[in-house]
UniProtKB/Swiss-Prot annotation:
Residues annotated for Fe cation 1 binding in this entry: 64, 94, 97, 178
Protein's name in the database: 3-demethoxyubiquinol 3-hydroxylase
Domain of life: Bacteria
Lineage of producing organism: Bacteria, Pseudomonadati, Pseudomonadota, Gammaproteobacteria, Pseudomonadales
SUPFAM superfamilies in UniProt: Ferritin-like
Gene name tied to this protein: coq7
UniProt source species: Pseudomonas putida (strain ATCC 700007 / DSM 6899 / JCM 31910 / BCRC 17059 / LMG 24140 / F1)
């Protein structure tokens, strides 16, 4: 039977640095799951439509950068091994979302947000602090964050042009995955944050969405 490898604190820091670089640099590999957009038809979009869709996908890409950082920060400070594993598994699934969003952004002749390093650092710190408080709070933060992401995805799905089936397929699959992450976190014992905390999180999310839509 294979034994589980135990990493030293230095090993974990180096792994975190590697993950940060792979998250923030242009994606060059292949996601574990192919993009849902692959099977959808190409359609002609006018310049205004393409620019708006690219802005929405840029927001979603930055949201996935934040989620990746949040999970990595929590995994670094999680107290229970099973919680750390859950965070790392969720982070792996977010890599697919990162790749899908970036691929779609490039197809629209645009680029990811230049603010991604800033939001990665902020989210990593928040995740690490949540993990230091308790695993229950850490898991609750995951659930609250993912529910906020689902809300944004619903709004973006309503804004997409009907003919853009590629972006729609990506966002619909992302929403399924994010909802599952939220429910899994609560089932694992995550704390249900009160309304004032969720409201504060929504204000922070608005700062991210407003700033990354264009840059």
């Amino acid at each position: 039977m294979a034994t589980e490898r135990h990493y030293s604190p230095l090993d974990r820091l180096l792994l975190q640095a590697d993950t940060a670089m792979r998250t923030l640099l242009p994606f060059s590999g292949q996601p574990a799951r192919p993009s849902p957009a692959i099977v959808q038809p190409d359609v002609d979009l006018d310049e205004q439509q393409a620019r708006h869709i690219a802005g929405l996908m840029r927001i979603n890409h930055t949201g996935e950068v934040c989620a990746q950082a949040l999970y990595q920060g929590q995994a670094l400070t999680a107290k229970l091994p099973e919680v750390r594993k859950a965070m790392e598994h969720a982070a792996e699934e977010e890599v697919d979302h990162l790749a899908w969003c970036e691929q779609r952004i490039r197809q629209l002749n645009s680029h990811p947000s230049v603010l991604n390093p800033l939001f990665y650092g902020m989210s990593f710190g928040i995740g690490a602090l949540a993990g230091l408080v308790s695993d229950k709070v850490s898991l609750g933060f995951v659930a609250a964050t993912e529910h906020q992401v689902c809300k944004h995805l619903d709004e973006h799905l309503e804004q997409l042009p009907h003919e853009d089936e590629k972006s729609r397929a990506i966002l619909e699959q992302m929403r399924i995955d994010e909802e599952q992450h939220a429910e899994s976190a609560l089932e694992a014992g995550g704390y249900r944050f009160p309304a004032p905390v969720r409201f504060g999180m929504s204000l922070l999310a608005k700062v991210m969405t407003k700033s990354t839509y264009r840059i």
